[in-house]
Each structure stands twice: as C-alpha cells, then as structure tokens.
Amino acid sequence: MDKLLIKASKPLQGSVRISGAKNAALPILMSSILADTTCYFDNVPELRDINTSLALLAELGADAKRVSGHAVEIDPSSINNCNASYDLVKTMRASILVLGPLLAKYGEANVSLPGGCAIGARPVNLHLQGLEKMGAKIDVEAGYIRAKVDGRLKGANIFMDMVSVGATENLMMAACLADGETVLENAAREPEIVDLANCLNAMGAKVTHAGSDKIRIQGVERLQGCRYAVLPDRIETGTFLIAAAVTGGKIRCENAAPETLDAVLDKLVMAGAVITTGDDWIELDMQGHPLTSVNIKTAPHPGFPTDMQAQFVALNCVAQGTGVVTENIFENRFMHVPELQRMGAKIDLETNSAVCHGVSSLKGAQVMATDLRASASLVIAGLVAEGETVVDRIYHLDRGYEHIETKLNGLGANIQRIK
C-alpha cells in the first residue's frame, strides 16, 4: 500500500495548474446517461473516483473511456442494464448519482447503497423522497435501492428538509427528462451545482436559477451529447494556497476560479496572506507575514466549505494564537485531529469544534489518513514538521487530488511516494 514520505519543506514557490473539480466531474459524467449521443468532457482530473465512475458507466453498458490526459468520451447509446453493483458503488458515495438519470431515461434503476468517506451519516432519503414525489416507486432491500416508474417521471414541487448537494444533483438530472416543471426548494447552491446545470443545458435541458436555493427545471423529451469542460477544483486550489501559507511561501494557482473561493480567500487574508486574483488565477504571498490563527464555521455554500475544514485545522496548529474550527455539516469529521496530535499539535475537541492552540513547530511522525480531506491536512502538517512524516493509507488522497506530490514537489516540497 502506497505511503507518502514528507520532509520539512522550504517556503513553497512558483506556479501550479489546478485540476478540474472532482465534485463537478462526477455528476457531469453521470449526466451522460441522460443523453442519446456521445458526450465529450474536458478538464476531467485523473483520479481514482473518476476511474470508478467510468467503470460504473461501462458496467451499465456505456462506452466510457479516457481518450487523452484530461479528456473523457462517453457514448451512452449502448447502455443495456440499470444495475449499479455493490463492488463499484461501495468505494464511492457519488455512485448514487446514477439513480436519477437511469430512472428518468430508462424507467428503472437498481443501485447499491453507497460508500465513500466514513465521515458520518449522509442518508440518501432526500434523493428517494424527491424521486417518489416525481412518481417513482422505490424499495430498499438487501442493500439495494430498487426504483421504477411507469412512463416518464412527473414534474413536481420538491422541498428538501436539509441542504444536500447530492440530492440536488440527482433530482435536477432526473427532472430534465420529466414531464412538466420541477421546482427544487432549499436546493444546494455550490458552484458544482451550477456547473452541472450548465452542462445539462448544453445537452438541451432547461434548467434555470442554479446557484440559488430555488432551481427550476422544465422537462424535455430528449437530450443530446455535448462538449463541456469541467470547472476548476476550488478545494484543490484552497489546499495548495494553505500549503503555501503555512510554509511562508508565494505561489500562483493557474486555471483557477477565484469567484468560487470567496469564503476561503477571506480567511487566508485574516491569517496574514496577501491575495491577488485575476480571471483564472490566484496568487498568495506569505513571505515576511506572520501566520495568525483564524476561527472557522463550516456552512453550506456560500458559507465556508466543509471540505476545507481539515486544512485550516492544520494551518491553525502552527499559527500564532488560538483558532476555533466548528464543523456544522458532518459529524465525525475530526478524525485527523488525533493524527495531528501525534505530530505535537495542541488541539482540544469540544463537541463539534476543534480548539487549536498554535505551537512553534510540529514533529514528523507516522500518521494515517482517515478520509480524503483529512489526508490533505496531514500532508500540509508534514511540510512544516521537523524531520520526516510518513502518511499511510493515501488511497484516500488519490480519490480527490491529482498527482498531489508531483505538484507540491514542483513548488519546492520534498515528498516521495513509497511502498
């Protein structure tokens, strides 16, 4: 099993190209199920979860392949079964996103209950309740969701009890081929939702007001394939910016989307960084500026993203003062804290908050990644820890970061992938 061996880094310097967003690419790949003809997707990152998605689409019968580095081609016309098996779905929570498209296009779907990161209860009931409002008959038995509909799904007014990115995506896709108008209230507002809506519209869908909490979808009879480029990954961008900040460096993130990172950039400025942005780039300069701890409260977009919480815990560990990081989205999302404590971090856990008391230095240690973003926080800590840090179970990292050690080494880090 691969590990990362990290040695203390000089201040990171230089420029790094940001990959396409995993959290946008996954639903966009699944949306191809809705089309009658071939879809061509660009800026698709090379990640384990993307490979799992392509394998899942192939299992359904689609011709799904990566044709070059970041280009993916999917011909859905050969789909001949509606069964998403446990073997693939167990490794990736986003597999649930085949449910809505299969049901809308083919009238049935049998999807194993999903896996993914073990960061608390993330129930699929909102997905199922919404599809039932659109006329689906759904049973959950033997670990599978079995859904059917007679004829087309019907447009409906759907109010979601809580904000859910996955449910918003699944229902938005299903509604594109429904009969009539669907209104999603209390919808998620993340940039990845907007990106999916733009892709669906490029296929011929009629989705409006994505990015607001009330999305309208006028169903159409057919969708066609399209060419679409996935938006840049705001979480990868934020992770590199924090890595530069904790090392006292200066970096430029190219192929970025600054408008998707307002909450993160604001906190980095509060931490002492000088931030400059352009249309598709972000520059952070921490040279000569003391790193100051910040308070964070995660919230649905446009609030502070939960996927950046662990990285800011790592920042607070080596910043001046005390910073409180409060997790309001998921329970059980502080599994990185005991690992950071092994490196000498002073963190007190209080219910859903991590109280981080900055220390002058961390010490290298053997640590274990527990989920995707937690693993990123350990890499960040390793960059500034004295001695060597070994991060185990980095398959979590490979699910969401494209060639992270290569990119960081290009900025001056010293990281090796070892067995």
Curated annotation (Swiss-Prot):
UniProt subcellular location: Cytoplasm
Binding site for UDP-N-acetyl-alpha-D-glucosamine: 93, 307, 329
Catalytic activity as recorded in UniProt: phosphoenolpyruvate + UDP-N-acetyl-alpha-D-glucosamine = UDP-N-acetyl-3-O-(1-carboxyvinyl)-alpha-D-glucosamine + phosphate
Predominant subcellular localization, coarse grouping: cytoplasm
Gene3D superfamilies found in the cross-reference section: Enolpyruvate transferase domain (3.65.10.10)
Any one GO cellular component localisation term in the record: cytoplasm
Active site: 117
One MF annotation (Gene Ontology) recorded for this entry: UDP-N-acetylglucosamine 1-carboxyvinyltransferase activity
UniProt pathway: Cell wall biogenesis; peptidoglycan biosynthesis
Residues binding phosphoenolpyruvate: 22-23
NAD as UniProt keyword: no
Classification via CDD domains: UdpNAET (cd01555)
EC number from the UniProt entry: 2.5.1.7
InterPro entries, alphabetized: Enolpyruvate_Tfrase_dom, Enolpyruvate_Tfrase_sf, MurA_subfamily, RNA3'P_cycl/enolpyr_Trfase_a/b, UDP_GlcNAc_COvinyl_MurA
GO biological process, one term: regulation of cell shape
Protein task: Cell wall formation. Adds enolpyruvyl to UDP-N-acetylglucosamine.
Family stated for the protein in its record: Belongs to the EPSP synthase family. MurA subfamily.
Protein name in UniProt: UDP-N-acetylglucosamine 1-carboxyvinyltransferase
